[in-house]
Amino acid sequence: MADSGRHPNPKLKVLVFAASLRAESLNHKLATLAARIAEENGATVDLASMRDFDVPSYDGDLEAGQGIPAGAQGLRRHLMDNDAFIISSPEYNGSMPGLLKNLIDWVSRFRPQPFDGRHGLLLSASPSLAGGNRGLWALRVPLEHLGTRVFPDMFSLAMAEKALADGDIGDTTLRRRFEKNLQSFLSLAEAAKHYPCIKRAWVEFLGEPPTSGADRVDPVETSI
């Protein structure tokens, strides 16, 4: 049979990193687990370190005099080289870490905007009973403002010192939920990669399916 010229779809490329500088942080462990599961589900994973994206405090005078720092340029390259991203972020005082917000502020200065149109999944691991959920809600705000399609189902792992004792989630139910959440995110990002129409019509809902009066759909561009 003659070669039809068709080739398998290229693998989904996913950037994964923890918004923590400590190598042994709970969120680094959760990010590493997410990277492993993503690879097991067929993705090509770019596991990065927050230390790769070191930047000074945002300063407009510094930007005007020296340009955007290398750490922010590094995150931009990683975002542009991948189809989607996963961030595992700790919660500091009911919000996201300051170093992550500062990095996002620097990256927001790029045009075209590297966060725009990319799918993102937010995770958190915390020793508290809340699991870092408040920090993830705070993190959604700047990412969505910059055009990220943040996956509706975030994952917060409470009492993570016990739950991640061996680098994996020991509780079977939680482990299954974590893996299912990742698989659903990867499926959506994969569909967006191979079917461009999905990028132009994005429906987001939390908990219940959208209704005609409550859903949010980005307008589809049409040529006249």
PLM regions with names:
Residues G67-L146:
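Helix-loop-strand module that forms the ligand-binding subsite of alpha/beta enzymes
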Residues G5-N41:
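N-terminal beta1-alpha1 ligand-phosphate binding loop
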Residues A2-P10, V150-I224:
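Glycine-rich phosphate/pyrophosphate-binding loop and the adjoining helix
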Residues M50-G67, A163-D166:
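N-terminal beta-loop-helix "entrance" segment that forms/cooperates
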